[in-house]
Amino acid sequence: MQTTILQESNYKEEMQTIVEPYLASIGTEFYLERHAGQKIHCMHYVPENPHAVVMLSHGFVENAEKYKEIAYYFAKEGFSVYLPEHCGHGFSYRMTEDESLVHLDNFERYVEDFIFVTKKAKEDNPGMKIYLYGHSMG
């Protein structure tokens, strides 16, 4: 299996013609509700015959969109990729009505939400190893 590594000089075109179509063909989008009204938005990319799971944890004031390239690389290498968006980020629930703010009552909320999604991944993929990949706050 050959994975195309995107070139900086042609990045936008390769994202549009290689990465995005591939992810669209293997991806699903869903919400998990840990507490009433608190829906965690998650992207899930499942390649043919995955051998393990990788949980991607994005950084502060980021969202799943920014991680399409790394999700592509992991999926092409046979990983089932889960990419939940933390509270206050992307399409996940917020603790304030102002969508321009990322407000959190307790940092443990990020940890507990991420564990909740990871348990779902474990249930959906019995016997598979689960790896964590985080960036910055993630």
State each model region's role.
Residues 1-33, 40-46:
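An N-terminal hydrophobic leader/cap segment in hydrolases
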Residues 56-59, 83:
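Structural cue for short, hydrophobic secondary-structure segments
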Residues 38, 63:
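Donor nucleotide-sugar binding loop of glycosyltransferases
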Residues 51, 58-62:
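Active-site glycine-rich loops that stabilize anionic/oxyanionic intermediates
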Residues 125-136:
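Alpha/beta-hydrolase fold nucleophile elbow
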Residues 102-123:
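Alpha/beta-hydrolase active-site loop
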Residues 51-54, 129:
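Alpha/beta-hydrolase fold active-site loops
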Residues 64, 71-97:
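Conserved alpha/beta-hydrolase
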